[in-house]
């Protein structure tokens, strides 16, 4: 059975390493990107099943890419993450999009990913 793939686009290195460690232990293949440009390349090349996308990145607002990402990957489960609650007002959760406030707890992760 193929491993599920997760892409984490976030410029906070500590957060990325904690998430990578968590998901690697769960049997996922994990890809990390610290910029939108790098993340979009990995998204297209590696075809992950799940995306964790931060909003405030060095090269732009991650959440502005949502429509483009959904258009090309309607099968992708997306978790939008931010430490800034006011950013959530512009996005509506759907079956495909989940919004989580940072810091993400292991309780949230365990409830979503077992």
Model regions and ranges:
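Two-component/phosphorelay signaling modules centered on CheY-like receiver
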Residues: 13-31, 97
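Acidic, metal-coordinating helix/loop segments flanking the phosphotransfer/catalytic sites
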Residues: 32-50
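The feature encodes the CheY-like receiver
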Residues: 58
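C-terminal output helix
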Residues: 104-113
């Amino acid at each position: 059975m193929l491993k599920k793939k997760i892409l984490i686009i976030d410029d906070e290195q500590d957060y990325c390493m904690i998430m990578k460690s968590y998901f690697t232990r769960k049997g996922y293949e994990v890809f990390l990107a610290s910029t939108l440009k790098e993340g979009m390349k990995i998204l297209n090349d590696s075809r992950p099943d799940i995306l964790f996308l931060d909003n405030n990145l060095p090269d732009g607002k991650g959440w502005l890419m949502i429509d483009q990402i959904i258009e090309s990957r309607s099968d992708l489960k997306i978790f939008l993450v931010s430490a800034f609650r006011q950013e959530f007002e512009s996005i509506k959760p759907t079956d495909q999009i989940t919004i989580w406030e940072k810091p993400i707890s292991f309780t949230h992760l365990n409830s979503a990913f077992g």
